[in-house]
Regions:
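Mobile, glycine-rich extracellular loop/lid and propeptide segments
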Residues: 1-24, 35-41
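Short capping loops/turns at secondary-structure boundaries
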Residues: 30-34
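Outer-membrane beta-barrel pore domains
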Residues: 24-29, 42-195
Length: 195
């Protein structure tokens, strides 16, 4: 496959208002402006794409975690199967990994009105791998700091309404939060423009 291998590395600041980190509820323990090194590599085999991730937080008494991840994407005609797994190798949390697996159909092409895509994912996320922020459009993960692990389903859809205009919707449901109250179902709808 053309451009089969890709890689990138970086070093930067990690900012979050997710709350307190590992040492307790004191303000001094809030994760803020902390250095992090990351590396990402992937290979497109043609029949599948495989990726690997690494992140290491630096110079921080509160947040010095090290995480490894792997992801796989397999197109099968108009369908796609994908998943990812992340493990925190330095945390003392009982639930130190996260994973998801999903099935999708279709492709919402920004240039072709009427095209659409639908995806469904099952997610299982441990407290030891979540530091705030998400690629989800919903706030399903906001209560994870009160529990230990969350399991839930997520359905997402995109429809191209006209060239460079898409409607996006997500619905997260069936949540089970370990050692805390289960969060309510969550949803979002957005209209997106590409310039």
């Amino acid at each position: 496959a053309k451009n089969a291998f890709n890689a990138k590395v970086g070093f930067g600041q990690f900012d979050t208002n997710y709350g307190v980190a590992k040492n307790g509820p004191n303000d001094k323990d809030v994760i803020d402006d902390k250095d992090a090194f990351y590396a990402k590599a992937g290979y497109n085999f043609g029949f599948a794409k495989l990726g690997a991730d690494y992140i290491k937080f630096q110079n921080n008494e509160v947040l010095n975690d090290e995480l490894y991840g792997i992801d796989l994407y397999v197109p099968v005609g108009d369908f796609r199967v994908q998943g990812e797994y992340v493990k925190n190798t330095t945390t003392t949390e009982k639930y130190d990994d996260a994973w998801n697996v999903g099935l999708g159909y279709g492709k919402a092409d920004w240039k072709k009105p009427g095209t659409w895509a639908l995806d469904v994912f099952y997610n299982e996320i441990g407290k030891g791998t979540y530091f705030g922020g998400t690629g989800l459009g919903t706030d399903m993960l906001k209560n994870l700091k009160a529990g230990e692990q969350i399991k839930f389903w997520n359905v997402g859809a995109d429809v191209t309404l006209q060239k460079n205009v898409q409607l996006h919707a997500e619905y997260a449901f069936g949540a089970d939060l370990e050692k805390a109250a289960d969060p309510d179902d969550a949803w979002t709808v957005s209209l997106n423009y590409k310039f």
